[in-house]
Amino acid sequence: DPNIQGIDELVINEESSKKALNFFKKNKCDKIVIFQTTFTDAKFILHFANVINKPICILAFPEPRTGGRLRLNSLCGLNLGMHSLIKNQIVPNFIIINKNKIFYTKKLNNFNKSKYFNNKIENWKKLSLGKNKKPLKEIKNQKIGIIGIRPDGFDTCDYNSREIKEKLNFNIKKLSLNNLFTESKKINKNNIKKTKFLITKDLKGTKDLNQKELEKSISIYHGLENIRKKHDLNAFAVRCWPEMFTEYGCASCGPMAMMNEKKISCACEADVLGSISCNILNQLNGKPSLLVDIVDLDDKDNSVVFWHCGLAPISMSKKGEARVGIHSNRQKPLLHDFRLKPGKITIFRVSKSANKLKFFLIKGEIQNRKNSFSGTSGVVSLGNNTS
């Protein structure tokens, strides 16, 4: 089609993003289709949308449920990008490609013909706690430790300290990653060996891991526990990469899963609102909770796949099924690797989409299916809760 033009290479870094932006500055288009082929942060898509200022449609792709590494993670990239754009008053169209070619072709044609865009922002402002001046008295006063700063382009992890205190009854203690690394290096080797022996009872395959890296990972668990006691903390939001790999030499997923088991909620990417969400669930139901990504969906049975690298507490596994894992990005332990056990669940998130604090709450049920991807995951039926 002579009316369609575009770039023929992936946007993977600063150089390629500038090249793509310059192309569309020179070649004027009425509308833009962005292929979210894999997971990325939202820096480029936000900057691109602001500069080009044209209607945007983002396409995400299904993820083959191989039981192995999560390779595309396209849907998660779509979620992150949409959140960032909506937060900045930009509401793009989006399409999740499925096997029904007629369906997504029709969606694309509708986007192409439509004269309207970015006119839905009011729909995202309706569900908010913006007018609620009172804190949640039913939730006990809590204190969350933020270790490190959230990665660039992860706008979902933003927070307002005053708002968290006034509306959610949470105080904040900021710490550096070096605080955690220093504390973890001081852990007695005997304590590390005792913990390694204990987790071997629940996790298969510990002997197959690099023992030095495994012990480093266990030391992070003890480091978190010592910091928790020192500062009287109830939850953590931790910058889990890349420094955990590159500077300390292990993954933090397993240690954080162990803290989650103790109902000390731990969220990756220094996601403060994510950790607060888990903490509130812990208080309400007295059981461990888990922060997850939505990485795949099936519109035929209205189900989604909840996943994270290896962050799920051991009690969420069926007895005898839990194994150790190594992180797919850096090949380092410790991760939990198992499917989430079947049963009814509460899905809850404190969110700040469209710059308004709000609660997302829905019921779900984990299905009795095999692990969709390495790490910890579950296929969750949403029943008639959504359409």
What are these model-predicted stretches?
Residues 1-146, 150-235:
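Metallocofactor- and cofactor-centric catalytic cores in central/energy metabolism, strongly enriched
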Residues 37-38, 54-62, 67-68, 74-75, ...:
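Anaerobic metallocofactor- and corrinoid-dependent redox/one-carbon enzyme cores
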